[in-house]
Amino acid sequence: MKEKRDLKIQAIENGTVIDHIKAGQALNVLRILGISSAFRATISFVMNAPGAAGIKDVVKIEGKELSVEELNRIALISPKATINIIRDFKVVQKNKVVLPSYVEGVVRCINPNCISNSSEPIKSKFSVLQSEEEGVTLNCLYCEHVISENIAENLL
């Protein structure tokens, strides 16, 4: 007899649940959101959990509703993620992340000669494109360098 296995993460009273994160990307989602050990709210996450659509990660952030801008940056590494806003243990809002057309100060340009990598106080700026064949592609607005792989490795 096949045993049923459920994904068990404690429910949160108020906060944000980020579901359907690309497998193995939960820690990078936390990096994108600027969440570190100094963050004082409760964070729960599961990596490589089985789901109906395959393997996924899930992140729960207690007591904090993230801004639309924060959430949409997640689309850089997990364009199919969904966001659930929780109040009194109930989902009151559910949205898919939206890939922004532009990001600033989120990703490091891979071109070592780019002005954003110099000692000048200039934040990196990228236009963001998505295609079925290539996935997410970032184009540096300063040097026109393209990042289409390993975006997570270049997060600031």
From Swiss-Prot:
Keywords associated with the record: Metal-binding, Pyrimidine biosynthesis, Zinc
MF-aspect GO terms: metal ion binding
Pfam families linked to this entry: PyrI (PF01948), PyrI_C (PF02748)
Functional summary from the UniProt entry: Involved in allosteric regulation of aspartate carbamoyltransferase.
GO cellular component: aspartate carbamoyltransferase complex
Assembly behavior: Contains catalytic and regulatory chains.
Organism in which the protein naturally occurs: Methanosarcina barkeri (strain Fusaro / DSM 804)
Cofactor (UniProt): Zn(2+)
Binding site for Zn(2+): C109, C114, C140, C143
Family: Belongs to the PyrI family.
Cofactor note: Binds 1 zinc ion per subunit.
Superkingdom as given in the UniProt entry: Archaea
Protein name stated in the entry: Aspartate carbamoyltransferase regulatory chain
Extent of the signal sequence: none
